Amino acid sequence: MIQHIRKFLQLESASGILLLTFAMFAMLFANTPLKDLYFDFLSMPVSIQIGLFSIYKPLLMWVNDGFMAVFFVLIGLEVKREMMVGAISNYQRAIFPAIGALGGMIVPALVFTLINNDSPEFQQGWAIPMATDIAFALGVLGLLGKRVPFALKIFLLALAIIDDLGAIVVIAIFFSHELSTTALISAAIAIAVLIIMNRMRVTAICAYMVVGLILWASVLKSGVHATLAGVIIGFCVPLKGKNGEEPLAHFEHLLAPWCSFVILPLFAFSNAGVSLAGMSLSTLFSPLTMGVALGLLVGKTLGVFSFSFLAVKLGIAQLSEGINFKQIFAVSVLCGIGFTMSMFLAGLAFGGDEADGQFISLARLGILIGSGISAVLGYYLLKLCTMPNIHINNLSK
């Protein structure tokens, strides 16, 4: 039994499968007699107090502001590694996925805004379809195994990473609330300490965790979204130590399984529970639901593919050897899997009063529809365009 579990966890698609499973459990709980237990569990208050400092939040907020900050540490580590030695480490490597990612942020936001042009109460959700869920998208890609060209995997990974950078900028600029000067000063001091540790090539991960915890608490109290602390921590961990150690890689390997198999499934379970009670066709076709769903399915596909295509045709970028535009189109569809990142942005966009709670449900429904169709359609398109030549020849006879 243990051996079977180990084999499953080693699969490229394991994290995506686990995310989907926990999301389905959330939908099951939210639409059965267990729904009161589910929602009461998420609203259960949890508090931490150290001297005069205290944080009092419902469990759902601890998941979204606390555990997700750990996930953003991993994002920061991955982005830094890829920028320094990986898929986006120089202009030639970065420009093609960067342009695709730019289209994948601009066009979905435009699609959402156009659909919600006459619904001002929904317009603050414009950023929801901008994000790509790295774990889910790579999980679907992993289902096809070695038949997917390595260059295509790198393109998707680099694009999703740049996409996340864009989401981080959006969170920092548009989703910060009233700012606390004292907390910001505390956060600035913590950042300064992290930078000094980086310059001194401190390799003790526990030191970054302690200072990072202070930074997270300060950012949380400051009014800036706490997950940004995670990104800063990730960027401050050095790639190399004084004696050749690799603290960044070590920290990344330490966090990756926890994020993939604990934090993200927990986030999915906490946020994917959409009650369908009282929903009708008018709910399904509400501007908010349709804006999010079509932003992910249509906006992402058109944005990523059209910008990538034009970049090559205009001579700005080059297609990597071994991949073609059919495969780029299929991957563009996969980029419409927003799921966890889109759920996260929905919580930030509509995180206020009771009406906003109803808006979150509509947005989540759109995310589930758009991400689900993108995953299935993207998988079959990619399967078709990576099919061995012998199969294609047989089909053409």
UniProtKB/Swiss-Prot annotation:
GO biological process: regulation of pH
Membrane topology, as annotated: Multi-pass membrane protein
Catalysis performed (reactions): Na(+)(in) + 2 H(+)(out) = Na(+)(out) + 2 H(+)(in)
HAMAP family: NhaA (MF_01844)
Gene behind the chain: nhaA
Keywords: Antiport, Cell inner membrane, Cell membrane, Ion transport, Membrane, Sodium, Sodium transport, Transmembrane, Transmembrane helix, Transport
Organism (species): Glaesserella parasuis serovar 5 (strain SH0165) (Haemophilus parasuis)
Protein name as annotated: Na(+)/H(+) antiporter NhaA
Entry annotated with the keyword Plastid: no
Transmembrane regions: 14-34, 36-56, 59-79, 95-115, 125-145, 154-174, 177-197, 204-224, 254-274, 292-312, 328-348, 365-385
Assigned protein family: Belongs to the NhaA Na(+)/H(+) (TC 2.A.33) antiporter family.
Cellular component GO terms held in the UniProt record: plasma membrane
